[in-house]
């Protein structure tokens, strides 16, 4: 038994194994088709004449030229033959297959050539086909190129079905080009247009291709409010005209009175340009400058001194309360960039003196302003520049009466006082290392800084690079508007004094 299995399945011996052989092709189908082509085509016209007696020699010529599917018989079953026939229809050649447009066109040319000389048609060989009667007019419209070719095989088996390309009725050669239904032309309706004899349309507004006198028309049902149904015609010039090539004369006759709520972009731009030009001309006629008198109401010209006094009073009352600039500086309001600095320290006794004296911000602005009315370009590194002005210090007041002088306090006490204050807050105290020197304690973004105010030859110097001053209040007053000459504090100034807290 083992020997028989080994010999039968060729187990363990690769030399006796034969390579797999490809399946032998079945040429019986090709032989049947060859025999079918050699047979004379007399049976096909008879079948066509049995279905329709009015076809004549044209249908016989068409059926003989297009051929038919083979009628398989014998060992092949009806189901297999139906499957093969349907497979040929599904995978047919788009150019040379039985349902292709090129083959239909050739069949129509053969029909026209075969039936042109006969006298069967009363019109001398010219047949009028319409889009609605193309499928039921004559036998040539009912028998398409692919349908006539497969008439014998489809009638013999109940499993054969027509493909989608063969279900459509073919269009004869005499019918003009019919565009698809989704490509339509909007025809402008005119009130003076009459009813064409092509047909009557009812309802709202419809689009339908019709034929009238051998010419293709596009009809649109006008609105019912105009009375009877009116249709406008657009004639296609030749066989190959598309709907967008058709030109309507009614479009040029229609006036501009109709407004559909749509405007071309060019027209909209032109209207906007015209509107802007009118607005600019209107503003030029007014002649009002925006920034001459920003807080004055529009009124008539001043005629008397009393009216001028009233207007001046009104103008002063409308000025901002926290603005200390004079009224003549309102010619350039975009230069208003002053920052209001809140005083964190307690007010000292010289409030009346500070109010009577001119504001340092005003003096600073007038110094920076050029004679021509503009601002001088000042660099950030120059000593004249200061982004934020510190609180004013009166250098004439002695050191012991200044609010930022705390006397003999330690470094830790000074840091505790500066801890809750903002950056650039400062105070002055006695130095712990020298009896005649003082220390300036400053809060920066990195912590606390303690700088020495040393006394040399009756002069006071801050650090090593500052100029000499006669008193400590002069040093503090000088660096409220300038940057400190201390390494690590080049960007800082003395802005916020820390006042002495009295219990």
Curated annotation (Swiss-Prot):
Tissues and organs where the protein is expressed, per its UniProt entry: Expressed in heart, liver, brain and kidney (at protein level).
An individual GO BP term: hematopoietic stem cell proliferation
Alphabetized UniProt keyword annotations: Angiogenesis, Apoptosis, Cell membrane, Cytoplasm, Developmental protein, Differentiation, Isopeptide bond, Membrane, Phosphoprotein, SH2 domain, Ubl conjugation
Upregulation: Up-regulated by okadaic acid and genistein.
UniProt KW Ubl conjugation keyword: yes
Subcellular location: Cytoplasm; Cell membrane
Assigned GO CC terms: cytoplasmic ribonucleoprotein granule; cytosol; nucleoplasm; plasma membrane
PTM section of the record: Phosphorylated upon PDGFRA, PDGFRB, TCR, IL2 receptor, FGFR1 or VEGFR2 activation.
SUPFAM superfamilies the UniProt entry points to: SH2 domain
Residue segments, region Disordered: 1-49, 61-81, 147-180, 225-262, 292-333, 345-381
Pfam families per UniProt: SH2
Protein topology in the membrane: Peripheral membrane protein
Entry superkingdom: Eukaryota
Phosphoserine sites (modified residues): 101, 301, 311, 382
Basic and acidic residues bias: start-end ranges: 244-256, 313-328
Principal location class: cytoplasm
SH2 domain boundaries: 404-498
Compositional bias per record (Low complexity), positions renumbered to this chain: 147-157
Domain notes: The SH2 domain preferentially binds phosphopeptides with the consensus sequence Y-[TVI]-X-L and mediates interaction with PDGFRA, PDGFRB, FGRFR1, IL2RB, IL2RG, CD3Z and CRK/CrKII.
Biological role stated in the UniProt entry: Adapter protein which regulates several signal transduction cascades by linking activated receptors to downstream signaling components. May play a role in angiogenesis by regulating FGFR1, VEGFR2 and PDGFR signaling. May also play a role in T-cell antigen receptor/TCR signaling, interleukin-2 signaling, apoptosis and neuronal cells differentiation by mediating basic-FGF and NGF-induced signaling cascades. May also regulate IRS1 and IRS2 signaling in insulin-producing cells.
Subunit structure: Interacts with phosphorylated 'Tyr-720' of the ligand-activated receptor PDGFRA via its SH2 domain. Interacts with the ligand-activated receptors PDGFRB, FGFR1, KDR/VEGFR2, IL2RB and IL2RG. Interacts with EPS8 and V-SRC. Interacts with GRB2 and GRAP. Interacts with CD3Z. Interacts with tyrosine-phosphorylated LAT upon T-cell antigen receptor activation. Interacts with PLCG1. Interacts with ZAP70, LCP2/SLP-76, VAV1 and GRAP2. Interacts with JAK1 and JAK3. Interacts with PTK2/FAK1. Interacts with CRK/CrKII. Interacts with IRS2. Interacts with PTPN11.
Protein name according to UniProt: SH2 domain-containing adapter protein B
Gene: Shb
């Amino acid at each position: 038994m083992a020997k028989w299995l080994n010999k039968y399945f060729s187990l363990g011996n690769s030399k006796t194994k034969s390579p797999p052989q490809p399946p032998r092709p079945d040429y019986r189908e090709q032989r049947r088709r060859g025999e079918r082509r050699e047979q004379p085509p007399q049976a096909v016209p008879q079948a066509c004449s049995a279905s329709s007696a009015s076809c004549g020699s044209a249908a016989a010529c068409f059926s003989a030229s297009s051929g038919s599917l083979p009628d398989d018989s014998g060992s092949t079953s009806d189901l297999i033959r139906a499957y093969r026939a349907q497979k040929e229809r599904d995978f047919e050649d788009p150019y040379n297959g039985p349902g292709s447009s090129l083959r239909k066109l050739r069949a129509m040319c053969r029909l026209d050539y075969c039936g042109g000389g006969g006298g069967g048609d009363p019109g001398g060989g010219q047949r009028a086909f319409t889009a609605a009667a193309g499928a039921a007019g004559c036998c040539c419209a009912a028998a398409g190129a692919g349908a006539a070719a497969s008439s014998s095989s489809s009638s013999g088996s109940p499993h054969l079905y027509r493909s989608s390309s063969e279900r459509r009725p073919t269009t004869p050669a005499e019918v003009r080009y019919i565009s698809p239904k989704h490509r339509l032309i909007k025809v402008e309706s005119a009130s003076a247009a009459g009813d064409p004899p092509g047909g009557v349309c009812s309802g709202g507004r419809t689009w339908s291709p019709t034929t009238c006198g051998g010419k293709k028309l596009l009809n649109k049902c006008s609105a019912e409010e105009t009375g009877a149904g009116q249709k406008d015609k657009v004639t296609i010039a030749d066989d190959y005209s598309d709907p967008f090539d058709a030109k309507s004369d009614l479009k040029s006759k229609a006036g501009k009175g109709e407004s559909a709520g749509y405007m071309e972009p060019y027209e909209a731009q032109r209207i906007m340009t015209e509107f802007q030009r009118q607005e600019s001309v209107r503003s030029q006629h007014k002649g009002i400058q925006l920034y001459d008198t920003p807080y004055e109401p529009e009124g008539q010209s001043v005629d008397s001194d009393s009216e001028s006094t009233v207007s001046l009073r009104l103008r002063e009352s409308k000025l901002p309360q926290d603005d200390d600039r004079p009224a003549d500086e309102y010619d350039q309001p975009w230069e208003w960039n002053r920052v209001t600095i809140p005083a964190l320290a307690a007010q000292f006794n010289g409030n009346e003196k500070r109010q009577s004296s001119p504001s340092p911000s005003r003096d600073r602005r007038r110094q920076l302003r050029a004679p021509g009315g503009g601002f001088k370009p000042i660099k950030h590194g120059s000593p004249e520049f200061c982004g934020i002005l510190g609180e004013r210090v009166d250098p004439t007041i002695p050191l012991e009466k200044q609010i930022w002088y705390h006397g003999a306090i330690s470094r830790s006490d000074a840091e505790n006082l500066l801890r809750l204050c903002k950056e650039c807050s400062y105070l002055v105290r006695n130095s712990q290392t020298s009896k005649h020197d003082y220390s300036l304690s400053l809060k920066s973004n990195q912590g606390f800084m303690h700088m020495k105010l040393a006394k040399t030859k009756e002069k006071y110097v801050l650090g090593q690079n500052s100029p000499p001053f006669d008193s400590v209040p002069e040093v503090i007053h000088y660096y409220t508007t300038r940057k400190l000459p201390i390494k690590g504090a080049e960007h800082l100034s003395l802005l916020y004094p820390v006042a002495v807290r009295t219990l």
